[in-house]
């Protein structure tokens, strides 16, 4: 039993799931929302999703608790999650890990506060700065010149940022990056705490760290104050479900208030029960599962590197600082040596081989391995990559390689987003201050954020990424032929 818990916690239980099954057997007559009334009002939807699914798509009620103010089965599920993940508190989130990340930032920061963070963060972090008015203090990461990817934050960079900005309220860390790169989280937590700052971890891609021997340290084990954990990415829950974990020194009641500022009052029981069931699964079998996932990824790395022309990178990148550790479950592959951009290999895999990988960028692809993968699918991916090399290999002249461009920050994201602005053709924006986001999605790391100066290098990158077929989002103009820039600001 957790300290202060009124429930006898048992990781074999899934209280939300069990309550829904009990509710289903009661055959309650619904005169509440949702209006499909257990699927009867929308037979096409019921046929598509199944009666069992729509039958538990229900509203909050006494026997099922309320996500905004949980006191029974949801509260117990949250305490079970906290126990399983080694946290003081856990919150079930139904707005994706975007909502978890934004809650962390909004909990730590008020308007005018400074927050230390790497620039290669997910858009949700910078969106939170637009909402709360906090000021980013960027620690620009090193770049691996061969791979063109940004690495982790070096300890001396974080220490320097803390000394130069002693009034900053928090340090935010990616654990890991999309490519599997980990910073020295324990050291950064200690530096932040010694300076009286919170340490926040974006663990959207690190759920398995809590259940895997030989994997990088989890945020809670490292002593971080808050962590946003994307259960649906590698933990098996439904898309859009997430966990927010907090340490013992974070006021859980205040965090709940922050969550309720933006989270829906109609929390999906499909999402919540998927978190509940998936937590139980990981608590019971997580270590075994992720050991198998790691073995599959290591096997795939060896096979892909044996093809020639590809570089499936791994633990050899670890240098004790900017790459303090590496997540071996991430199957990231450099493709430029076969003359193809990552996004081109991504498209070929989908269009020619019916294989959907997570993303392709300028120089790399990522195949996401998790609890649902099997050896035969890995073999199919390896075979497809070998055939792509044989069929499509070129000399690669004219390919860009760099994924990260240091930003020139002129004003805060909030001030820039809400400032007077005008729309200019893309090439006429050079030297201006951007008032909107521009990013390839996935991974959703902004090329430009509000308040940053637009340079010729950035414009070249945008045009190149568009030409290669990257899915670009953010600006008002969906074709990204124009950008909004601040008026009267150079």
Regions flagged by a language model, labelled:
Residues 1-72, 443:
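N-terminal "arm"/small-domain region of PLP-dependent enzymes with the aminotransferase-like
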Residues 92, 138-140, 229, 359, ...:
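Structural signal for conserved beta-strand scaffold positions within catalytic alpha/beta enzyme cores
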Residues 38, 178, 233-234, 249-251, ...:
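Short, glycine-/Ser/Thr-/acidic-enriched flexible segments
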Residues 64, 91-93, 171-174, 332, ...:
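Short glycine-rich or small-residue beta-strand-to-loop segments that form or flank ligand, phosphate
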Residues 54-96:
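Conserved N-terminal alpha-helix of the aminotransferase class I/II PLP-enzyme fold
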Residues 299-475:
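Conserved C-terminal alpha-helix-loop-beta "cap" of PLP-dependent enzymes
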């Amino acid at each position: 039993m957790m300290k202060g818990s009124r429930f006898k916690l048992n990781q074999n239980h899934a209280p939300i799931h069990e309550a829904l099954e009990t509710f289903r057997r009661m055959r309650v007559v619904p005169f509440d929302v949702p209006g499909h009334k257990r699927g009867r009002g929308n037979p096409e939807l019921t046929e598509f999703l199944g009666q069992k699914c729509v039958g538990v798509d229900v509203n909050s009620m006494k026997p099922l608790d309320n996500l905004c103010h949980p006191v029974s089965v949801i509260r117990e599920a949250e305490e079970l999650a906290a126990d399983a993940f080694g946290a003081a508190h856990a919150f079930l989130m139904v707005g994706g890990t975007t909502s978890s990340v934004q809650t962390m930032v909004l909990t730590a920061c008020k308007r005018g506060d400074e927050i230390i963070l790497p620039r290669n963060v997910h858009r949700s972090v910078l969106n939170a700065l637009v909402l709360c008015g906090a000021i980013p203090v960027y620690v620009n990461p090193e770049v691996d010149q061969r791979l063109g990817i940004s690495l982790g934050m070096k300890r001396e960079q974080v220490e320097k940022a803390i000394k130069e900005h002693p009034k900053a309220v928090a340090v935010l860390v990616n654990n890991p990056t999309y490519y599997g790169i980990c910073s020295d989280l324990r050291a950064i937590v200690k530096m932040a705490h010694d300076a009286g700052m919170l340490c926040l971890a974006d663990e959207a891609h690190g759920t398995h760290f809590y259940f895997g021997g030989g994997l990088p340290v989890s945020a809670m084990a490292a002593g971080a104050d808050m962590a946003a954990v994307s259960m649906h990415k590698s933990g098996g829950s439904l898309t859009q479900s997430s966990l927010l974990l907090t340490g013992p020194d974070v006021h859980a009641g205040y965090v709940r208030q922050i969550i309720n500022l933006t989270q829906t009052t109609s929390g999906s029981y499909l999402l919540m029960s998927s978190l509940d069931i998936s937590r139980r699964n990981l608590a019971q079998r997580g270590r075994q599962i992720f050991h198998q996932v790691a073995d599959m990824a290591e096997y795939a790395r060896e096979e892909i590197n044996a093809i020639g022309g590809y570089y499936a990178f791994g633990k050899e990148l670890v240098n004790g600082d900017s790459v303090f550790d590496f997540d071996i479950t991430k199957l990231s592959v450099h493709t430029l040596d076969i003359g193809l951009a990552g996004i081109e290999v991504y498209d070929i895999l989908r269009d020619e081989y019916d294989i959907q990988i997570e993303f392709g960028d300028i120089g790399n692809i990522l195949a996401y391995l998790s609890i649902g993968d099997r050896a035969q699918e890995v073999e199919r991916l390896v075979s497809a990559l070998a055939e792509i090399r044989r069929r499509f290999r070129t000399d690669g002249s004219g390919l860009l390689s760099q994924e990260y461009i240091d930003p020139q920050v002129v004003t805060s994201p909030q001030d820039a987003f809400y400032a007077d602005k005008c729309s200019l053709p893309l090439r006429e924006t050079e030297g201006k201050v951007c008032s909107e986001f521009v990013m390839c999605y996935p991974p959703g790391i902004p090329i430009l954020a509000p308040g940053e100066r637009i340079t010729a290098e950035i414009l070249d990158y945008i045009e190149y990424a568009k030409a290669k077929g990257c899915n670009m989002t953010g600006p008002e103009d969906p074709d990204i032929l124009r950008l909004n820039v601040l008026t009267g600001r150079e």
